[in-house]
Curated annotation (Swiss-Prot):
GO terms for molecular function: nucleotide binding. Nucleotide-binding protein. HAMAP family: YajQ (MF_00632). The lineage of its organism: Bacteria, Pseudomonadati, Thermodesulfobacteriota, Desulfovibrionia, Desulfovibrionales. GO terms for cellular component: cytosol. Belongs to the YajQ family. Transmembrane segments: none annotated. Keywords: Nucleotide-binding. This is Nucleotide-binding protein DVU_1981. The keyword rRNA processing does not apply.
Length: 163
């Protein structure tokens, strides 16, 4: 039976490139000269630490990060910005969690949307992904179109199409 997987994967190298491009832009921009501004990617737990002199510069850094992620074909919806915290040096700090994989509640919404479509396919939750199987590839392509139209709060990729 034909099947495919619905996943939410981040290309880690592209994310690293986006963060490095933001670092380069910080070095060249006039408004960031002589300020405490840092951005670091922690690959182990998929988070980005952003430190800026004040909240205005923090917003500018967020916009730069969004722009560079889009240029690198990373959907900005996978970035979850935490609360802004004050540091001991008078600067502000913010953690950005990178969401990868499909959470259980989002996977249930995806399976429910597939069932509500009345197509002859089945959706099954497998760890951090959803496997969709059906008798016809045309039905699977209709499911892909349906899921692209829906808003589940995370970027979805469709991989491993088997015939």
């Amino acid at each position: 039976m034909p099947s495919f997987d619905v996943v939410n994967k981040i290309e880690l190298q592209e994310l690293d490139n986006a963060v490095n491009n933001v670092k380069k832009e910080i070095e060249t921009r006039y408004d960031f000269r002589n300020t405490t501004t840092e951005i670091d990617l922690h690959k182990g737990d998929l988070r980005i630490t952003v430190v800026a002199a004040d909240e205005m510069k923090m917003r500018a850094l967020e916009e730069m990060l969004h722009a560079h992620c889009v240029r690198r074909k990373i959907d900005p919806r996978c970035l979850e910005f935490k609360e802004i915290e004050a540091t001991s040096r008078g600067a502000v700090k913010r953690e950005v969690q990178v969401k990868e994989g499909i959470a259980k509640d989002v996977a249930q919404k995806i399976v429910k949307a597939i069932k509500d479509s009345k197509l002859k396919v089945q959706g099954a939750i497998q760890d951090q992904q959803v496997r969709v199987t059906g008798k016809k590839i045309d039905d699977l392509q209709d499911v892909i179109a349906l899921l692209r139209e829906g808003d589940f709060g995370i970027p979805l990729q469709f991989v491993n199409m088997k015939n």
